[in-house]
A protein has these predicted regions:
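N-terminal Rossmann NAD(P)H-binding glycine-rich loop of SDR-like oxidoreductase domains
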Residues: 4-19
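Short beta-strand element of Class I
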Residues: 28-30
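Helix N-cap at the beta1-alpha1 junction of Rossmann-like dinucleotide-binding domains, i.e.
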Residues: 35-37
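Conserved Rossmann-fold cofactor-binding substructure of NAD(P)-dependent oxidoreductases
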Residues: 55-69, 76-79
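ADP-ribose/adenylate-binding Rossmann-like module
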Residues: 79, 90-108
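Rossmann-fold NAD(P)-binding glycine/threonine-rich loop
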Residues: 102-123
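C-terminal catalytic/substrate-binding lobe primarily of soluble NAD(P)-dependent oxidoreductases
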Residues: 145-328
């Protein structure tokens, strides 16, 4: 099995490559990155099964050439609102199986529709194999399976506990932070009252989490909100929520959004501020409460044995100290 790891020496890609390398059936991993020297240097940490190379994914001819020589492409190249859809299209055209960690709802919608492309029947494409989406979907699914009838499905996480990677090939603005900026401005798509709706992100939602009680979280644009009703159209509501336990964090994020929408700062400047803010948070930062929502969770409301109940599923253990790459 030969694998092309796009963005393979980036903050997320490094963890994917290390994990794939441990599988004996993997014959070759091509670590492809716009930063060729970083890809080659990272690949040198492994044996000859891993090779680093430079690749500009916006060069479609070069991308097709590389994909046509492998069995699987693993896409960890962000921001996904810019790159996910065209890369999957190329995978379909070259008959190459596709996996990604796409965390934007807009391309997720478009990529799900590609299932209707007759050419796609020859490949397997799995979207959102990260922490969120990915792990959150599994946690929410476990919660759903505890119910006889499911009405609401929420995925959620603590945005203030996500720490960026120390090692990455990326220079300039952090792609994950650009993603975050895009999903907190304007409007995002959610599923409410059995239909898709565009709503204002960061709107406060109350969630009565089992054994914890009523807590506040905020709507954040993400694939889970649109992918659950795609697969389970019988549900009434699907949201992705984020919370920030550090005192004043959500207020700070809303203020940054205001500056963007007043055109006082650019999206790239906002992304740089968010990157600095996440790196500045420490375990000593004052918390809002000693009892908070889990760092990552899946939540469902519905009916069990004729009674209205809520189910929450999280990871056994604290994941607050994990970086985004480790969690992914």
């Amino acid at each position: 099995m030969k694998i092309l790891a796009l963005g393979g020496s980036g903050g997320m890609g490094r963890f994917a490559v290390r994990s794939l390398f441990n599988h004996k059936q993997v014959e070759k991993i091509y670590v492809a990155d716009l930063n060729a020297s970083s890809a080659i240097k990272f690949a040198s940490d492994f044996d000859d099964r891993v090779e680093g190379l430079g690749l500009d994914i916006t060069n479609n001819a070069a991308l097709k050439n590389k994909m046509s020589k492998v069995d699987i492409v693993v896409n960890t190249t962000g921001p996904f609102f810019k790159f996910a859809e065209p890369i999957l299209k190329t995978a379909i055209e070259t008959n190459c199986n596709y996996f990604d960690i796409c965390d934007d709802w807009e391309p997720t919608e478009k990529m799900l529709l590609m299932n209707d492309d007759p050419r796609s029947s020859d490949i397997t494409a799995i979207l959102g194999l990260g922490a969120s989406p990915g792990l959150t979907n599994i946690l929410a699914y476990i919660s759903m399976m505890e119910l006889d009838e499911v009405e609401k499905v929420y995925t959620g996480w603590d945005i203030s506990s996500a720490k960026p990677e120390e090692e990455s090939s990326q220079t300039g603005v952090n792609a994950a932070m650009l993603h975050g900026v895009e999903q907190m401005i304007g409007q995002v798509k959610v599923f409410k009252n059995r239909k898709y709706q565009m709503v204002r992100p960061l709107k406060e939602i109350k969630i009565n989490y089992p054994s914890i009680g009523e807590k506040s979280a905020n709507i954040f644009g993400h694939p889970e909100a649109v992918s659950f009703p795609y697969h389970y159209p019988e549900i009434k509501e699907s949201l992705n929520l984020m919370h920030g336990e550090e005192r004043g964090f959500i207020g700070t994020v809303k203020f940054i959004r205001l500056l963007i929408e007043m055109k006082l700062i650019t999206k790239k400047t906002a992304a740089r501020i968010l990157t600095w803010l996440e790196k500045s948070l420490t375990p000593k930062t004052q918390k809002l409460s000693s009892i908070s929502l889990p760092s990552v969770y899946g939540y469902a409301e519905g009916v069990k044995d004729g009674k209205n109940v809520a189910v929450g599923t999280t990871i056994d253990g604290d994941v607050r100290d994990l970086t985004m790459g480790e969690a992914t």
